[in-house]
């Protein structure tokens, strides 16, 4: 049976992550409070941030920026908006 969590992002019970997605206390908190669905949404947001800001993930400053954005996305007031992004209309 899948592990269920009260997802902090979705505000409801959902299937939890299989393992901590990040090292340290932040990774433990993500594992305990974030669902697979919310993590997948973050991965899309992270990809847009990397691409639109032309981040080089070999650069420690870029990785630190993404870590701050991830924390803001889940536990703060939301990650930075991607400049110029217009969501597709249905």
UniProtKB/Swiss-Prot annotation:
InterPro entries on file:
Fe_traffick_prot_YggX, Fe_traffick_prot_YggX_sf
* Keywords, sorted A to Z: Iron
UniProt GO molecular function: iron ion binding
Record-linked Pfam families: Iron_traffic
Q: Name one GO cellular component term.
A: cytosol
- Asked if the record carries the keyword Transcription, the reply is no
GO biological process, any: cellular response to oxidative stress
Q: Which SUPFAM superfamilies match?
A: YggX-like
PANTHER family membership: FE(2+)-TRAFFICKING PROTEIN-RELATED
NCBIfam families the UniProt entry points to: PRK05408.1 (NF003817)
Sum up the protein's function in the record's words: Could be a mediator in iron transactions between iron acquisition and iron-requiring processes, such as synthesis and/or repair of Fe-S clusters in biosynthetic enzymes.
As for family, the record states: Belongs to the Fe(2+)-trafficking protein family.
Q: What protein name applies here?
A: Probable Fe(2+)-trafficking protein
Q: Whose protein is this, by species?
A: Polaromonas sp. (strain JS666 / ATCC BAA-500)
């Amino acid at each position: 049976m899948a592990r269920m969590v009260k997802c902090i992002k979705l505000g409801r019970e959902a299937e939890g992550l299989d393992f901590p997605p990040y090292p340290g206390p932040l990774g433990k908190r993500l594992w305990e409070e974030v669902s697979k669905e919310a993590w997948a949404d973050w991965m899309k947001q992270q990809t847009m941030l990397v691409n639109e800001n032309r981040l080089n993930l070999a650069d420690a400053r870029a990785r630190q920026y993404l870590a701050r954005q991830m924390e803001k996305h889940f536990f703060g007031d939301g990650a930075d908006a991607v400049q110029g992004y217009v969501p597709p209309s249905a």
